[in-house]
A protein has these predicted regions:
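Short beta-strand->loop micro-motif that forms the acidic, two-metal-ion catalytic signature
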Residues: 42-47
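Catalytic core of pol beta-like nucleotidyltransferases
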Residues: 1-24, 32-34, 38, 49-107
Length: 107
């Protein structure tokens, strides 16, 4: 099971790198905590080193990860933000605190 998890994490990182190899990728939620169920989704935060990250950019990443979703049979929930916005205006949100506490950086 651990090998499968690592395989999926590697696939996610590889797909993100195909779009932006400088992006930070963070796994969070039940998969990061280790209390997931078999059908739990994969929660992924992608932080970009660019100022403007719009819905089109986020959709690009979502579509790029779709092949993995189809392969594993569970959703990959993706948030994409600029790193500066995430560490600035979003730093007061419960999601920020949760990801800071439990998130795992995918190298």
């Amino acid at each position: 099971m651990i090998r499968r998890k690592q395989h999926i994490i590697n696939l996610i990182r590889q797909k993100v790198n195909e779009i932006d190899n400088t992006a930070e990728v963070i796994l969070y939620g039940s998969r990061a905590r280790g209390d997931n169920k078999h059908d739990s989704d994969w929660d992924v935060m992608i932080l970009l080193n660019k100022k403007n990250v719009d819905k089109k950019v986020e959709q690009t990443f979502r579509h790029h990860l779709l092949d993995i979703e189809l392969e594993i049979g569970v959703p990959i929930s993706v948030f994409v933000y600029s790193k500066s916005d995430w560490e600035g205006k979003y730093s007061v949100t419960p999601l920020f605190r949760s990801i800071k506490k439990e998130g795992i950086l995918i190298p």
